[in-house]
Amino acid sequence: GPMGIMGPRGFQGPAGEPGEPGQTGPAGARGPAGPPGKAGEDGHPGKPGRPGERGVVGPQGARGHNGIDGIKGQAGAPGVKGARGIPGERGRVGAPGPAGSRGSDGSVGPVGPAGPIGSAGPPGFPGAPGPKGEIGPVGNTGPAGPAGPRGKGAAGIPGVAGPRGIPGPVGASGATGARGIVGEPGPAGSKGEPGSAGPQGPPGPSGEEGKRGPNGESGSSGPTGPPGIRGSRGIPGADGRAGVMGPAGARGASGPTGVRGPSGDTGRPGEPGIMGPRGKEGPVGIPGIDGRVGPAGPAGEAGNIGFPGPKGPTGDPGKVGEKGHAGIAGNRGAPGPDGNNGAQGPPGPQGVQGGKGEQGPAGPPGFQGIPGPAGTTGEVGKPGERGITGEFGIPGPAGPRGERGPPGESGAAGPSGPIGSRGPSGPPGPDGNKGEPGVVGAPGTAGPAGSGGIPGERGAAGMPGGKGEKGETGIRGEVGTTGRDGARGAPGAVGAPGPAGATGDRGEAGAAGPAGPAGPRGTPGERGEVGPAGPNGFAGPAGAAGQPGAKGERGENGVVGPTGPIGSAGPAGPDGTPGPAGSRGDGGPPGVTGFPGAAGRTGPPGPSGITGPPGPPGAAGKRGDQGPVGRSGETGAGGPPGFTGEKGTAGPQGIIGAPGIIGIPGSRGIPGVSGSVGEPGPIGISGPPGARGPSGGVGNPGVNGAPGEAGRDGNPGNDGPPGRDGIPGHKGERGYAGNPGPVGAAGAPGPHGSVGPAGKHGNRGEPGPVGSVGPVGAIGPRNGIQGIPGIAGQHGDQGAPGSVGPAGPRGPAGPGGPPGKDGRTGHPGTVGPAGIRS
């Protein structure tokens, strides 16, 4: 029975929560612009889906009794082509899926291995069979039309199979018409256009139309019997008339929910959404010190794809239209020229500028600058005169602590030090807060048309045409009278080869004789008419294999005896021992070229299968090109100077020694010899402050002091004005072509189609193998008399099936698959050049 209608498809589970986006890392110092990064490698293609399970084949209907053979009539003239039946109503088409973008014509990939056959599903309810329609007469074959361009559509939506009709009675067989004269071949047409048809042969005489046999009664459903013995080939009868189309069968009950089918073709990405409004500007954050560029974070995983809406109801199946007679396929037209590249479309509108992001946390402090060069050492001053040692005074009490003076003026900014080398990458910063989802953007304008695809590969050579039918057997000639022996004359011309004689018993091989002189080549005889085919003989018992005889000498040609009756072919005996190689025989006349057989008719396309569920989402797209690097903002204003540190406390006062005893005044001594200058004594206790001396001259420049400690970080400065737009980056290189997707899994088998009309009889079979050589005749005179023509051989066995016809036309385009997932996040590109300060 017909297969049940496929049940509704189950809903897809809801999409999971998308992961929180990573927080923004600290801003690094902008390095020099690097070359644009290469496009990332394509992602691995997804695994093909599991093939669907095959449904259970419905029970086979009961076979009707064979009708009574009609009276054999003569072949009738070709009837008028019957009117085409009313086409059935077409089922409602479901909502179209997104159209897939057409790719370039790729080379034909290898056919993948067939998937495993799934377990059988429950059988569907059989529909009510419709009445048997009469077969219409075959119309005259029209001229071949020009071959249309080869379409490249997607797989069509399979239709629901209609009910299977009850086979009607076998029509009466008509007599075979006389073979028409083969027409002259038409002149060769221009390339791509069909050649003109040759003149049609004269039609055979009109025969009586065979009477239609009674309809067979529908038998009860029984087990399938063993195959019967193949009968002899019947004579084709006259074509019947087309019957009235039966009513549509009752709609079968909905079957269970079908198993998910194989993966569908990857759909093209959806249109870009409308750009969301500009987000609210957040509060101004504390600007951090320019940090170093952190390492690139791992690529985020693509979010889950949304689940599609519920599938619409399936339309009622349309009525099956009557099958029209297919015309002879025309010659294939020449391929058209490659189309020109389409004009480039206008650029899309510029998107709204996004809002300013939140300020990231402060980065680590920068490295300490390199100290400046040391100053030159000044000249050593002249030593001053030694002062008079003062008396020890009593130290005064410590004065009150002075007030803190006002802060000094900020020093002028020193010259910028050399640019330090790039430090190691800092640790990745914490992930930023999750941003609000933007509104779907408006669809962008269409991009420029792609260039023309590469010309497809040349198609494979077509199947060789079927072998033409064998001509009719001519009338058997009369037996000639036996002539008298004449005088021995010169060797005569070689006569035409006589018909093959019956296969005799295998004799013993004689010894090879000396080769005789080669006679002159005779003129080939005229081809005789083939006689009618005789009845098939019965197989005789197998003969025992004889022992190979000794190699005898070649004897003279004997008198040809009368041809015996054709014996029935016995079964093949066991293989004998191969005999010695015989001498090469004379070449036979060239064979006559056979007539080309009639072109077979293209069968009707089978019913469309049930639409499979949409395939899984496509693989992730390849990484996008590196975008232009924006310029950096201006440097913020410097912070206020740091506070001056407090003055340290004075150390403890030393202990004052006791005054010494005053000695007796000595006498005036005689000045002695000046001694050598002694070592400088220890520094005495500071005396009271002396009077302010005169101002000294300008001293030499002092030596540069050691670099002071870094001051504390100043307060954050205000945000600088937004910088000007940077120079657009270089246009990225064109990405590499993606790898071809995986070969799709084999689809689930469609429902059993309705039984088509009976095909044409096959071509006559190849001639049987050459019979074995008969025994050598008795030695006769040199010139033998003309032999009696042998009886015509039997017909060969049934020929092998003809070659496969051309493939049918492609079905209509199927619905596109669901939109693919978003591609993986690309790796950050190299840092661009620093922007120009305004």
UniProtKB/Swiss-Prot annotation:
Main location: secreted
Compartment(s) where it occurs, according to its Swiss-Prot or TrEMBL record: Secreted; Secreted, Extracellular space; Secreted, Extracellular space, Extracellular matrix
Tissue: Forms the fibrils of tendon, ligaments and bones. In bones, the fibrils are mineralized with calcium hydroxyapatite.
Keywords assigned by UniProt, alphabetized: Calcium, Collagen, Extracellular matrix, Hydroxylation, Repeat, Secreted
Family designation: Belongs to the fibrillar collagen family.
Composition bias, Low complexity: 11-38, 101-122, 137-147, 215-236, 329-344, 407-424, 436-446, 479-523, 530-550, 568-581, 593-602, 649-689, 703-718, 736-758, 766-781
GO cellular component: collagen trimer; extracellular matrix; extracellular space
Region annotation (Disordered) ranges: 1-838
Annotated function: Type I collagen is a member of group I collagen (fibrillar forming collagen).
Gene of this entry: COL1A2
Xref: InterPro entries: Collagen, Collagen_superfamily
Post-translational modification as stated in the protein's UniProt record: Prolines at the third position of the tripeptide repeating unit (G-X-Y) are hydroxylated in some or all of the chains.
Keyword Cell division in annotation: no
Complex and partners: Trimers of one alpha 2(I) and two alpha 1(I) chains. Interacts (via C-terminus) with TMEM131 (via PapD-L domain); the interaction is direct and is involved in assembly and TRAPPIII ER-to-Golgi transport complex-dependent secretion of collagen.
UniProt KW Hydrolase keyword: no
Biased composition (Gly residues): 351-360, 447-456, 582-591, 633-642, 693-702
Basic and acidic residues: compositionally biased ranges: 39-53
Protein name: Collagen alpha-2(I) chain
